[in-house]
Each structure stands twice: as C-alpha cells, then as structure tokens.
Amino acid sequence: MTNRWFNVGKIVNTHGIKGEVRVISKTDFAEERYKPGNTLYLFAEGAAEPIKVTVSAHRLHKQFHLLQFKEMPSLNEVEHLRNMVIKVPEEDLGELEEDEFYFHEIIGCEVVSEDGELIGTVKEILTPGANDVWVVARKGKKDALIPYIASVVKDININEKKIKIHVMEGLIDE
C-alpha cells in the first residue's frame, strides 16, 4: 500500500437513517473525488490501518457533502465513522492541466526573484477567493504573501522545487 496519503475530507456526523455521512470537503475536485464507484480510505485517530470504502451515493446538502458507502448501508454501520479523515493514495490523485499544481507540490518550494535572490520557502497556501495566495516564510523577517497570478509568478519548476516571481513594488515588506 502507498506511503503518501492526501486528505480529501472529514466525516463530521451522520445524516438521516440511510447510512449517509456528513463530510466537510478538503478537495477542489469534490464531484470527481466523491463520485459513486470511487474508493476512499477512512483514517481513525490511532488506528493502524485505514478502512477501505466504495462510494455508492453523493449529494450536496447545505455546506456539506453527503456520502453513502456500499459496505455500510445503514445508520448503525456508519455511526462509528464520525471524526474520521477521508484520504486517497497519491496514485489516485489524477493528472492536472499543464499550469495546474497540487498544493503539496508547491508547499516547500523555494521562491526566488527574477534576479535570483532567495526570498523564502512556501509554507502554506491560502484560498481567499479570486486567486490563491502563497505564504512564504522568510529568514528573520515577516512572512510574505504572494498572489498566484501571472503578473507575479513567472516560472514554477516542481522538479527543482523552485518558483521564480516578479517582485512588484510593495509586494514584499523588508
């Protein structure tokens, strides 16, 4: 089994009597990830092995995703799943378009200016709205907030874990 797992949601409660669970999604690809027939893995805190489940139904309800699993068709069978984290193995992530990246590929990358000056390392990605914002940790200075927009991010090399940016005036506090 895989060594790398990626969080795609968390079961926060049950819903109704038909074995549905309420999920807070942690993926940008919920429709794809929770599609009936897909395999997901449920991780309980402290458990040695995940529980492998197959999605049998998926629907939206308010701000939650409601999932049913083929292996657990009743409320009694899903009650113990509360607070479990839903993950997928790395090989199930799927391919992205040419200029799209998974967060785990960006986090940890070095950020340099167009002049080659080291700015810092991406430590977190925020998703406030129109575009993502990368939080860049800098040695001995405040974190820099870098918008993921074409006028700022000039090159991303995932293999070298290096990102080149155009430092606009006022973008980075000294």
Swiss-Prot record:
SUPFAM superfamilies linked: PRC-barrel domain (SSF50346), Translation proteins (SSF50447)
Example GO biological process: ribosomal small subunit biogenesis
Protein location: Cytoplasm
Xref: Gene3D superfamilies: PRC-barrel domain, RimM
Transmembrane domains' residue ranges: none
Coiled-coil region(s): none
Comment block on domains: The PRC barrel domain binds ribosomal protein uS19.
Protein name, UniProt field: Ribosome maturation factor RimM
Gene for this chain: rimM
